[in-house]
């Protein structure tokens, strides 16, 4: 790009950001440290590809891990180039659902299939094995989801990696049989089933690759094995593939994230260009130095050194305390000192690792006369009334959705007991009927 002819939307980018946006090779790994402007880079790159008339918006696929991030990515790209509204910018799971509904016949599914979340999966386990406790059902649902993250089927020889429980293979197999018989899928299927279909069906694979000539992935360090396999099938030899991530921020191993996906990216995808974003616009240097002093001991990392653009800043303090009560008292002391020095309560945020830890603060803070507000205790879609309404809608769209049917069949109360409910489900299953029609026929008889 000739100096002096830079478009307005590229102004303000630092040299590394500009290089990442304008790079035209087929394989690009952007190592973006915290606070280095990666969201601006990836959204500007989407708009830049369209503005330069290299690609149609419809040929661009951008995936990330949360709806909030996907919405922000879309809005910021559209602010630069409105036609980016036509690009496919979604979460991995949302893209998987989009892909499966458009290829439903290839999956032997109806396009109106229901998608089971973690609670639904646990309920399905319980419907198959009613003697299991609620906790056991949740544990098995979690293990099944984990198996799918690692692309392991019930007959996989490596399933012991997930669980050595002698009954797990049978439970997983029964769960899959029931899920398929009802024509529904769970969250893990939204990644695994498209990946497996694209691997075996050359026609659909080629058609999909022709559709999506550009693939961008945000927060790549959080990707799991199934998502990696899906990405391998989506990106053809001539596709432009750009992933953005930070191997130093890979903290979701317990959810199945595989840091090797980003560490091995240059080995798996030949001729990869690596661009490092190391200018931090968020934190002071003291915080960056503290973080670096810890993460530098990781043996397997691609490496980068963050430099703060903000001057000054206080050094972080680390306190070693004996128990949670002492931690809470320490936080209370710091908070009261801040207010005593003419600060405000609203200036203070306290982060804790698990929701259960909030109980200690709720118990002790009133004793210290400290006002507080807990943020994000219950997610909108986890509220009972919201899940009930979604279940009613799911039944309208897919009358074979057993889990949604069981959730709302007695809301409001209709006097349908467990025995009657089992009879409806069994009658539907053995006669190839949906649950609404099965109910009608049983009532008529």
Q: Model regions: which residues?
A:
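A basic/glycine-biased coupling hinge at the interface between accessory DNA-binding modules
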Residues: 2-8, 25-28, 33-36, 47-214, ...
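SF2 helicase catalytic motif II
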Residues: 208-227, 242-243
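Conserved SAM-binding loop
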Residues: 42, 62, 89, 243-244, ...
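Motif I (Walker A/P-loop) of helicase-class P-loop NTPases
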Residues: 39-48, 73-74, 227-228, 331
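Pre-Walker A adenine-sensing motif
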Residues: 11-22
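Conserved RecA-like helicase ATPase core segment
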Residues: 2-12, 44, 48, 161, ...
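ATPase/helicase motor core of nucleic-acid motors
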Residues: 95, 268-269, 311-315, 341-445
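Helicase P-loop NTPase motor core
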Residues: 30, 34-42, 104, 270-273, ...
């Amino acid at each position: 790009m000739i100096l002096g002819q830079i478009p307005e939307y590229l102004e303000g980018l630092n040299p590394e950001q500009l290089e990442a946006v304008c790079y035209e090779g087929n394989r690009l790994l952007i190592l973006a440290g915290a606070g280095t402007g990666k969201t601006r880079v990836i959204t500007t790159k989407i708009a830049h590809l369209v503005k330069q008339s290299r690609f149609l918006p419809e040929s661009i696929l951008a995936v990330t891990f949360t709806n909030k991030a996907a919405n922000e990515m879309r809005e910021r790209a559209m602010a630069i180039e409105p036609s980016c509204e036509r690009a496919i910018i979604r979460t991995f799971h949302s893209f998987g659902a989009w892909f499966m509904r458009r290829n439903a016949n290839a999956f032997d599914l109806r396009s109106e299939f229901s998608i089971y979340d973690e609670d639904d999966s646990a309920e399905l386990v319980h419907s198959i094995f009613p003697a299991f406790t609620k906790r056991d059902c949740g544990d098995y649902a979690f293990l099944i989801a984990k198996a799918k993250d690692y692309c392991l089927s019930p007959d996989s020889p490596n399933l012991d990696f997930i669980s050595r429980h002698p009954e797990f293979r049978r439970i997983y197999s029964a769960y899959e049989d029931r899920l398929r018989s009802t024509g529904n899928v769970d969250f893990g299927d939204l990644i695994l089933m498209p990946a497996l279909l694209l691997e075996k069906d050359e026609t659909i694979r080629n058609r999909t690759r022709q559709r999506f000539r550009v693939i961008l992935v945000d927060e790549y360090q959080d990707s799991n094995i199934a998502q990696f396999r899906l990405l391998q099938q989506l990106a053809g030899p001539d596709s432009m593939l750009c992933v953005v991530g930070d191997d130093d921020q890979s903290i979701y191993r317990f959810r199945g994230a595989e840091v090797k996906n980003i560490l091995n990216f240059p080995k798996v995808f030949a001729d990869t260009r690596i661009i490092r974003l190391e200018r931090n616009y968020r934190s002071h240097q003291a915080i960056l130095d503290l973080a670096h002093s810890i993460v530098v001991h990781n043996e397997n990392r691609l490496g980068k050194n963050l430099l703060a653009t903000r001057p000054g800043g206080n050094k972080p303090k680390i306190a070693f305390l004996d128990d949670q009560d002492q931690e809470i008292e320490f936080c209370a002391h710091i908070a009261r000192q801040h207010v005593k020095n003419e600060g405000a309560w609203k200036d203070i945020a306290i982060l804790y690792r698990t929701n259960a830890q909030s109980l200690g603060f709720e118990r002790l803070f009133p004793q210290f006369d400290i006002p507080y507000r807990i943020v994000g205790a219950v997610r909108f879609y986890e509220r009972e009334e919201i899940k009930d309404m979604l279940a009613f809608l799911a039944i309208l769209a897919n009358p074979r959705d057993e889990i949604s049917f069981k959730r709302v069949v007695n809301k409001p109360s209709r006097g349908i007991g467990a025995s009657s409910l089992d009879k409806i489900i069994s009658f539907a299953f053995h006669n190839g009927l949906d649950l609404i029609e099965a109910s009608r026929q049983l009532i008529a008889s």
